Amino acid sequence: MPRSQRNDNFIDKTFTLVADTSLQVIPTTQGEKKAFTYYRDGMSAQSEGEYAEASQNYYEAMRLEIDPYDRSYILHNIGLIHTSNGEHARALEYYFQALERNPSLPQAFNNMAVICHYRGEQAIQQGDFETSEAWFGKAADHWKQAVLLAPGNYIEAQNWLKITGRLKD
């Protein structure tokens, strides 16, 4: 039984009902419908911290989904799981793959910037200021892209860019 049919949360049930109804009305193939079901179940598992189950669902969705735009969101969510698990290098790979398919995904740029900023902070703690500047530079580049795509979002990133003098580059 799909996860979405096991959920007791009212909001999730409502979303599932609306999504299922939309899938019946909008012309889609069986593969696309199945991919969406796996994606939806992956999101549900991920929101509950069930990362292994979420990953399995996302990989199944990737196997079935052919649309690059839809695949970008699946890849982004896989990146989120790797970020949550502290696997930053793998997370960055998935965010890059998501952006290859959808260059207008500000949350992927933001998440890459957060990882780069974190690595810059780690380098400072290790006394490696040259490496920290390189990581902070990458963070700035990614945050600039995120802010460009979603100007009203990422206020903290905008403030960091201003405070550190990186906004004008």
Curated annotation (Swiss-Prot):
Keyword Plastid among record annotations: yes
Subcellular location: Plastid, Chloroplast thylakoid membrane
InterPro entries on file: PSI_Ycf3_assembly (IPR022818), TPR-like_helical_dom_sf (IPR011990), TPR_rpt (IPR019734)
Keywords assigned by UniProt, alphabetized: Chloroplast, Membrane, Photosynthesis, Plastid, Repeat, Thylakoid, TPR repeat
Gene3D superfamilies for this protein: Tetratricopeptide repeat domain (1.25.40.10)
Membrane topology value: Peripheral membrane protein
Coiled-coil regions, chain positions: none
Role description: Essential for the assembly of the photosystem I (PSI) complex. May act as a chaperone-like factor to guide the assembly of the PSI subunits.
Family: Belongs to the Ycf3 family.
Protein's UniProt name: Photosystem I assembly protein Ycf3
Taxonomic lineage from the root: Eukaryota, Viridiplantae, Streptophyta, Embryophyta, Tracheophyta
Gene designation per UniProt: ycf3
